[in-house]
Amino acid sequence: AGEGNGRGPYVQADLAYAYEHITHDYPKPTDPSKGKLSTVSDYFRNIRTHSIHPRVSVGYDFGGWRIAADYARYRKWNDSKYSVSIKNLQRRTSNGNRRDRKTENQENGSFHAVSSLGLSAVYDFKLNDKFKPYIGARVAYGHVRHSIDSTKKITQFLTTAGARGTVSTVHPPYKSTQDAHHQSDSIRRVGLGVIAGVGFGITPKLTLDAGYRYHNWGRLENTRFKTHEASLGVRYRF
């Protein structure tokens, strides 16, 4: 038997695989504006990651159209990067002394889609008693947190050549500068998305659901966040 044309409330549980694209508009390292110099690398400006998370929904089936409220909580992303480079600034061939510059970058960043509370309207196309493809639209209130802690330290030091048969001497740094960019935000916004999928009727009341949804979480101040999700779940109509 298929799902039937009955109406009534329903609940749905899904397991979703999400591809997440996060874009941060941090100040550029070359930004001439005073106080807006940034040490954040491109890695933390343009983040692509993925996660698996559960989603629950409650709704009402009108016999073609459905409306539902859903809730999801995503996995927290965090990472750290450290890099160091040494560049020779000057070398004297007469005595072998040299002056070098050491650049160290330490970055720690995190992003967490804390919650998404959505409301969707879905239309089911009844092909037969078993299969019902569907399309829909979704509006959601999302909460995200993100932070970045980036430090760039530049040190210049002198190395003097020793006498023949002895090791060189590295002297304490004679010039050192340090720049840092720290930012932490907790933002709530309304975003829009689309839904598509297909339902397979197991019993008149129980449906296996395979779906896809795209959601733009809105302009989160200096951050843009978009998700593509593929999900598999079951829907039970009372």
From Swiss-Prot:
Annotated stretches, region: Disordered: 88-109
Compartments, record wording: Cell outer membrane
InterPro entries in UniProt: OMP/PagP_b-brl (IPR011250), Porin_opacity (IPR003394)
This protein's GO CC annotations: cell outer membrane
Keyword annotations of the record: Cell outer membrane, Membrane, Signal, Transmembrane, Transmembrane beta strand
Highest taxon above the source species: Bacteria
GO molecular function terms attached to this record: porin activity
Coiled coil: none
Signal peptide: 1
Function, as annotated: Implicated in a number of adherence functions. OPA proteins are implicated in pathogenesis and are subject to phase variation.
Similarity-based family: Belongs to the opacity porin family.
Annotated protein name in UniProt: Opacity protein opA68
Source organism per UniProt: Neisseria gonorrhoeae
